[in-house]
Amino acid sequence: MDAENYIYHKEAITMDFYKRALELKDETVADRRYIHENAEAGLELPKTKAYVMDKLKEYGLDPVECGEGVTAMLGNGGKVLLLRADMDGLPMPEKSGEAFACPTGKTAHTCGHDFHAAMLLSAARILKEQESKLKGTVKFMFQPAEETFQGSKNMIEHGILENPKVDAALAYHVSPGKMPVGLFMYNDKGTMMYSVDGFKITVKGKGSHGAYPHAGVDPINIGVHIHLALQELIARETDPAHACVLTIGQFKAGEAANIIPETAVLQGTIRTNNTKERELLVRRMKEVAEKTAAVYNGSVKIEMISEVPPLICNPALTDEMIGYMKEMDIPGLTPVPDVSASASEDFAVIAEKVPSTFMYLSAGYTDERGTYPAHNPKVQFNEDVCPIGVAGLVHCAVQWLKKH
């Protein structure tokens, strides 16, 4: 299809973009499978970043590094819409059985970020084909380290929201499970995903022989009391009407049974859907740890590993974007409102700074392939979601820029 021959009016444009996305499906899937098979985790993704930049150049864009991520722009001045895709995997083995599974046994795309990057690449290609007709500017954000909650912050610090200033932002996340492809899930009334404040408490005691505990200060004993005291914060200091979770997921201390160690380390997360409760819990976590340690003659060092707010989508922008999604004549496309999840997403850092919308796109199966959830080594995602995601990104961008 000649890109310049698209019929550019509301009634026809949506189906044309979906048709174009279907034409590009094989290439989108190939991009997804390459990124999947070469999964990288964390802040530095050299192979993934190089692949994304090469593809953008192939499509006629001029990508540049932005911190540890990649950005590119196209359009004609005016308002600026940011389209964001994360592209990092997880530090875990893959057992999906797919022919393109990551072979290293150390990293895997079990959260679908390979889809996000591949769909945004194809969306960039279509938008480049339509650049002369755009009524504004689209900025693309290919982000690392979402899983460690570092990526958005890294790219913000390197200017992703400036030069030109971003006016609004949109991101998708694919969702596996036992459900058909075609659902798009959103929340325009409240918190869509919880905050996450990751913390590390290093308890400092005094080492001694296990036979002479009085000669030392036991950091394991202090750590146990800190752990128990922190659970009371949820039970007795937070409003039961608000969802709050405090979890200690790691407790490490000692090397031998007859030695009281010098230190113990606790790591955990605080998650909530309420900003005030978040502030309370972070402050009280620090106070409880410090004062409990002091009671037993020890001390603590507290480090905040991640600080991500709740993901709260802008209601007006979300209503607008959902309206554009509903315009698309795609078989099986179905809105699912009022979705909220206790997981966290560092797109919330973007949403805290500019009006933003975040949607889940179902990428599941109704048979046994939909058995496993995200972050499971056996999870499988349905590649039929690809043209839906591509068309949605393009259509929402075109329509939003046209209106604004």
Label each residue range with its predicted role.
Residues 8-109, 114, 118-135:
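Acidic/His- and Gly-rich active-site-bordering loop/insert found
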Residues 82-84, 93, 199-201, 358-363:
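Non-cysteine beta-strand/loop elements that form the S-adenosyl-L-methionine
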Residues 58, 224-404:
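Metal-dependent amide/peptide-bond hydrolase catalytic core
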Residues 18, 22-29, 42, 46, ...:
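Electropositive phosphate-/nucleotide-binding environments in soluble metabolic enzymes
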Residues 35, 83, 113, 140, ...:
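Divalent metal-coordination and catalytic microenvironments
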Residues 70, 90-92, 98-108, 115, ...:
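Histidine/acidic-residue-rich, glycine-tolerant segments that coordinate divalent metal ions
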